[in-house]
Amino acid sequence: MKKERETANKYRQQALEGDLMAMNNMGVCYAQGTGVVEDHVMAFQWYMKAAELGDIYACYNVAECYYQGDGVEQDFERALHWYLIAAEKGDVQSQVNAANAFYLGQGTKEDHVKAHQWWLKAAQRGHLQSQKNVGAYYWNGDGVEKDDSWAAFWYEMAGQQGDPQAQFSTGWFYMTGTGVKQDKRKGLKWIHRATAQGFEHAKQWCRDNGYSIY
C-alpha cells in the first residue's frame, strides 16, 4: 500500500507538471483505487485533462467512461466523439468501437459504410474480429460492393490467427473456388484446421461431403 501511495503521488506530481501519461495514470489510479481512495468521478476528470491535451490513451478512456456511464453520465454520442479522436490517432480498439457504434447506430445514425471503413482500418492492424467483419461485409455486399476475392482474403487473414470459423470459411472458398483459384487439397487442410479445434459446423460439412473429420 505504501508503494502504491508513493507511485500515485509521483504520478500526481508529474501530472501537475504537465505530463500527459501521468495524467492518464492518475485516472487509472482513481479508477482502480491504487494508492488513492477509489473515485470514478476523479478518474474521469484526470482522463479528460489528458484527453483534451491529446493523449491517445486518455481519449480512449474518456470514451469508455461515457460509453459505460462510469464517473460521468452515460452519453453514446460523446463516447463516439472520443473514440473517433483516438481512432484517428491510430488506437485499434477505438477504431473497433467506432465501427461498432456506426454499425449499431449508437450515438449516431446507423451507417454501415463508415462501420466498414473503421473495421477495415482495425483489420489492417491485425484485429481478428474486424478481419472477420470485413470479410463478411465483402461477402454480403454490406456497406461495400460485394467482392468474393476480398471476402476470401480477409477470412484467410483471420484464419491464420487461429479462428476456427474463419478457417472453415477459408477452406470452403478454396474447395469451391469462390474468390480464389480452386484448390481442394488446400481447402481441406483449412477445414481440418477448424475441425481440430472442435468446430462443429466444419465437422458436419466433412460428414455431409464424404471427407474424414481429421
Would you name each region that the model predicts?
Residues K2, R193-Y214:
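Terminal, low-structured helical/coil segments at or just beyond the last alpha-helical repeat
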Residues M1-Q32:
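N-terminal segments that cap or nucleate solenoid repeat domains
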Residues N25-Q32, V36, N61-Q68, N97-L104, ...:
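Hydrophobic face of amphipathic alpha-helices that form TPR/SEL1-like repeat modules
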Residues L16-D19, Q32-T34, D39, E52-I56, ...:
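Short helix-capping/linker turns of helical repeat alpha-solenoids
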Residues F153, K181-E200:
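TPR/TPR-like (Sel1-like) alpha-helical repeat modules
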